Amino acid sequence: MEKLNTGLDSNSRKAVADALNGVLADTYVLYQKTHAYHWNVTGPQFHTLHVMFEEQYREMWAALDEIAERVRAIGHFAPASGKAFADLAAIDSADAKPPAAAQMIKNLLEGHETLIRRAREALDIAGEANDAASEDLLTVRIQTHEKTAWMLRSMTE
């Protein structure tokens, strides 16, 4: 942990960093799952899902950097190994064998909903710490994952 004089006390920064690292881990696992599904999707909806999954994993890839850099900006370190991400994540990693396309959609929907809940918890922690920058980042993450969840949910109806 670095010494900072930015108006956030060290305990608050630690709590926010821990919460952000949880969101980061879930984002990383969901990114990997989405990317694997992009590679392995088959069936009549192949092209639609292949393109959609690519848009989703590219968006999450960019978000990973933003979240990790926020953790660094408040004086803490981001997880740096697959094991660390797996230990922190609430989302299950990609399946050993690719599921059918319909199950991929359901699995991703569940992952996005889990991530939304996790980001809301982190948002509350950032709010208690008066960390407006982390609140802004988390608000955008919630909005993005809610929109993606809506689109995935619409494909299951």
Predicted regions and their residues:
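Internal glycine-rich alpha/beta core junctions
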Residues: E2, N21, A73-F77, D87
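Disorder-to-helix initiation segments
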Residues: E2-V23, A101
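Helix-loop segments that flank and shape redox-cofactor active sites
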Residues: L8-A15, L30-E55, A122-A133
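Amphipathic alpha-helix face/heptad-repeat signature
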Residues: V16-D26, L30, Q56, M104, ...
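A structural signal for well-ordered alpha-helices, especially hydrophobic packing surfaces
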Residues: L24, Y31, H38, Y57, ...
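Conserved alpha-helical segments that form or flank metal/cofactor-binding pockets of metalloenzymes
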Residues: V41, Q45-A84, M155
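Acidic/histidine-rich alpha-helical segments that form the ligand environment
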Residues: E69, K83-V140
